[in-house]
Structures are given as C-alpha cells and as structure tokens.
Amino acid sequence: MRVHVADHPLVAHKLTVLRDERTDSPTFRRLTEELVTLLAYEATRDIAVEPREITTPVTTTVGVHLRSPRPMVVPILRAGLGMLEGMTRLLPTAEVGFLGLQRDEETLEAITYANRLPDDLSGRQCFVLDPMLATGGTLVASIEYLFLRGARHVTAICLLAAPEGLRTVEDAVGDRADVTIVTAAVDERLNERGYIVPGLGDAGDRLYGVV
C-alpha cells in the first residue's frame, strides 16, 4: 500500500478553510470540489495510457491517450458525492459507479446499503472518493468489493486521514502495490466517537446539512 500526502500550499489553504467551523455549506462544497481536483492530479500520476499517433497543424507526432478500459470513479454515498465534480473535472471520460457504505455508530463497522457498479471490473483502475478516512472500515470494505469484481488497481482519494484508519487499511491489504491512498493531510488521532481530530467535523453534514 502506498500513501501520498499532497504537500502544496493551495491544498493546505483550502483545507484550512474547510476545517473552519464558520465555513458555510456552499463554500464548503465549492472548496471540496477544488481540493479534490488538486488531489486528483496526484492520484492520476500512474493512470494507464498508451501511445497514439496524431497530426498537428505542423506535422505528425506520437502522444498518449487513456488506455481502455476507462477508469472507474466510485464515490461512497453520501459524502463522496461532494467530491465527484472535482474528480470528473480532471477525468471527464471516466465512468462513474456508486457504492453505498455507512458506518454503524455503535460498532463503527461498515454496512453496505447500495451498489450501482458493473459486476465485472476486470482490468479497471478504480478511484474511490471518500472524504474522511477515519476508522478505515468503509475504505477496506470498498477496496475488497472492487477487487472481488476484478479491479486492477484501487486509489482512494480522501480529504483527511487518521493514523488509525491508515493502519486498518494497511493491515487489510498488506504490502500489495495495487492500493494507493491520496490525502490532503494525516491528522492526529480519532476521538472516542471515531471522529478525526482536529478534523473538519462530519463531511456529509457540512456538505449537505444535517439529515
């Protein structure tokens, strides 16, 4: 497993505004999209491409284009939806699937309640969008779900990660090189309720309001 923390002043600036409890939902949504686009740039460094010959106004040359099958972007409902626009802005030709996983607040375990994904993901690079890597249960369940359907590589894009969550994922996937986590920051710890500290609160509630 590889972990990449995006070290960039714009990432740090946008994350600081997201953390601020005074930031309203419209601003939070906009900054989430912007931050995800920055993280997506890092997350797609190893995206699969192949050579392609083209003709410019001057001559012919060889460039690259995305290799088939197309990448799959998988937002985890509901908070991951707030990251989708930022990801597809950079990767507009990707297919989009949806996975509904939520954390049981008593056991902190992930529960699957929705699935809108192809049964066969053979050869696919999958990009999981989940803003908060807290306990790690949701991400582990997502990774296992995608690999069971044949995914070739899974990259998770998270706004924040907790050390406990990273350890949980690492324990589950080991040293396999086909799992990558890209995040804006690794925070201090989880509190007794399983929330990231200092964190930014409940990302879903801050994106969409309390439901």
UniProtKB/Swiss-Prot annotation:
EC number: 2.4.2.9
Amino acids binding 5-phospho-alpha-D-ribose 1-diphosphate: 78, 103, 130-138, 202
Family matches, as Gene3D superfamilies: 3.40.50.2020
Binding residue positions for uracil: 196, 201-203
Single GO MF descriptor: magnesium ion binding
Record flagged with keyword Calcium: no
Reaction(s) this enzyme catalyzes, per UniProt: UMP + diphosphate = 5-phospho-alpha-D-ribose 1-diphosphate + uracil
Pfam family, one: UPRTase
EC top class named in words: transferase
Keyword Nucleotide-binding: yes
Domain of life per record: Bacteria
Free-text remark on how the cofactor is bound: Binds 1 Mg(2+) ion per subunit. The magnesium is bound as Mg-PRPP.
Name the record gives this protein: Uracil phosphoribosyltransferase
